[in-house]
């Protein structure tokens, strides 16, 4: 897919890997929507990219809330009239073993790390398919492939993300779609 002028949405884009992904997309000629829950960091990231002459939009988004993800999609279409790429990158981690993780920490981790990508896929897939081609990527972790010690909720969420993206890719291929799906599993 030629990326020039295409539109990418990156969650968790205010810092770290998300900002690096947004920077890479922008450098390749894409218009980029940066989404993050941290408003101050998001404003800084948007300034950083726009000061380089890139076409960017920042949208404060809590990916654990479907209404926020839907508002992100609406803002993207309103600003750029299209979306071609979604990168579900927002994530959190709680370092606690199964049996010692509070139910609140389980819910928080699963809401952001698993439900966030689910909301992203379900909200953005129809919009991306309207373009005739595109890509949806979700960031998991090596913990999505191999359970690490004392990372119960994180392991479960990231295994779910790997399964979500494998299921999505299979469904897209079965439908002979020009949209692709992939999962990124960074780790040591």
PLM region spans:
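A glycine-rich helix->loop->beta "capping" turn
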Residues: 52-55, 75-86, 94
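Residue(s) in the substrate-gating loop at a strand-loop-helix junction
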Residues: 141
């Amino acid at each position: 897919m030629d990326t020039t002028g295409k539109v990418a949405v990156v969650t968790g884009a205010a810092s770290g890997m998300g900002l690096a992904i947004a920077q890479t997309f922008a450098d390749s000629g894409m218009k980029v929507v940066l989404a993050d829950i941290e408003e101050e960091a998001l404003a800084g990231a948007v300034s950083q990219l726009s000061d380089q002459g890139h076409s960017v939009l920042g949208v404060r988004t809590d990916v654990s809330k479907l209404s926020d993800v839907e508002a992100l999609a609406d803002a993207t279409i309103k600003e750029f009239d299209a979306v071609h790429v979604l990168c579900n990158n927002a994530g959190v981690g709680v370092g606690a073993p199964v049996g010692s993780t509070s139910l609140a920490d389980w819910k928080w981790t699963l809401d952001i790390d698993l439900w966030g990508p689910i909301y992203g896929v379900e909200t953005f897939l129809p919009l991306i398919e309207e373009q005739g081609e595109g890509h949806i990527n979700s960031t998991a972790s090596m913990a999505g492939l191999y359970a690490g010690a004392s990372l119960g909720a994180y392991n479960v969420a990231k295994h779910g993300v790997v399964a979500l993206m494998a299921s999505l890719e299979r469904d897209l291929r079965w439908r002979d779609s020009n949209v692709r799906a992939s999962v990124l599993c960074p780790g040591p």
